Amino acid sequence: MELKDYFPEMQVGPHPLGDKEWVSVKEGDQYVHFPKSCLSEKERLLLEVGLGQYEVLQPLGSPWQRYLLDHQGNPPQLFETSQFIYLNHQQVLPADLVELLQQMIAGLEVILPISTTQTAFLCRQATSIKVLRSLEGLLPTLESDFGLALTMFVGNAWYQVAAGTLRECFEEECQLLTAYLKQKSGGKLLTFAEVMLWSILSHQSFPALTRQFHQFLNPQSDMADVVHALWSEHGNLVQTAQRLYIHRNSLQYKLDKFAQQSGLHLKQLDDLAFAYLFLLKY
């Protein structure tokens, strides 16, 4: 008999899980995951001791996993810009799908299996709008090919943040996505601004994320007038520049610099709406 016969709830994937409710065991070039809730004390003890050719993964191997998921150690390095892309799925991701996503996501640093139904991808650069559109168009094909319902959430591009801040933002982005999916259906690509808009309108609180944006979006900031003018002019750059009495090139420079520092591209309607409502609320 095979392990699946003894443990029907087990799942197989290409990476160990960071979820403390599961035990990950290495078998060859893949990992077998056992839910602790379905294991007896004797079975858990056997897994902890080891089962012959099976290697129990303890602790997790990646420094990024230990730092972000277990609050242990330090990150191996920090990048000028860091961005997390989250994938919600019904079961552990197949190795073929993980390999395909690795090829598609530019600047991928590490894969973080958060649980059997959620995986994060840490990128050392911001993901371009072109790549996001490609991913969005490909999601239905991936769902069909692999028989999985997938929801992809593109986190914010964090610029020059400290290690502790990056971890706080990672944790709150996870919480934000979980809260959103409890009330909304998934099955598509979600942008950070889109989900943050929902959080403001539904009175959800994410202190670390709020602190980050309050640095750039507050009544005393230079960008407050730009955001209000852009909103009033429905995103028209020429009319916004005229309203602010500045050259269009100067306005474009401000927008580019703001996008680099905050991760928000104010020429995108959702980003502009989030920035505008954030200023009204905070």
UniProtKB/Swiss-Prot annotation:
One Pfam family hit: HTH_30
Query: Any coiled-coil ranges, and where?
Result: none
This protein's superkingdom? Bacteria
Cited InterPro entries = CdaR-like_regulators, Homeodomain-like_sf, PucR_C-HTH_dom, PucR_C-HTH_sf
The protein's job, in short, is:
Not essential for viability or growth. Nevertheless, uncontrolled production in E.coli is detrimental to the normal physiology of the bacteria.
The protein's name is: Leucine-rich protein
- Tell me the classification of the organism that encodes this protein: Bacteria, Bacillati, Bacillota, Bacilli, Lactobacillales
